Amino acid sequence: MTEQQKNFPEFYVTAPQPCPYLPGRLERKLFTHLTHDKPPALIDNLLKGGFRRSQNIAYMPYCEGCQSCVSVRVAVNDFRLSRSFRRVLDANKDLTVRRIPPRPTAEQYALFREYIDARHADGGMADMTVLDYAMMIEDSIVDTFLSEYRLRTGDDTEPQSAAPLMGIALCDRLSDGVSMVYSFYDTTVPRRSLGTYMILEHI
């Protein structure tokens, strides 16, 4: 095997299975394994080119006759806040954010379970155990971090880690930006639009 062949990823296609987004449709995915022997630039380009990461697998939709799923990249310098986006930011001014190492905790998993049970109880992640969650957070060969969102308590003497956890975003650092891998949040406060807020906060 030549060095060029070794560095070039092998791609695979999954068998058709029910689409989790569009009823009555089938989905397929194109995927490749991310391994330490692959050049970092190659992995970076895959993620910038529309592939998503799940642990050490990069994948993208590969469905026949359907292109409804679109990977979105935001050009930060060209982005302009709409009125609705400003309202979302205003509604969450009482939150703090920290960028922390990708280390799973029981507190995170409890919020993750509440989110999955409320939003995706019939989805592919519904049966994830605490070990599965830990692997999702820790199993990465790229530069990964967590964005941790907590409610500001107003008590400067209280450790920040004691404040209520409102959301978590698992992110990868790329050469020209950030890729949000997965996020979850407190679903009991819909007026906050926390999913939208976390995207805006990263922008």
What are these regions (language model features)?
Residues 191-203:
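Conserved acetyl-CoA-binding loop-helix of GNAT-fold acetyltransferases
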Residues 33-36, 120, 202:
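Histidine (H) residue identity feature
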Residues 54-65, 71-191:
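A conserved beta-strand-loop-helix scaffold within acyl/acetyltransferase catalytic domains
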Residues 1-103:
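Terminal substrate-recognition subdomain of acyl/acetyltransferases
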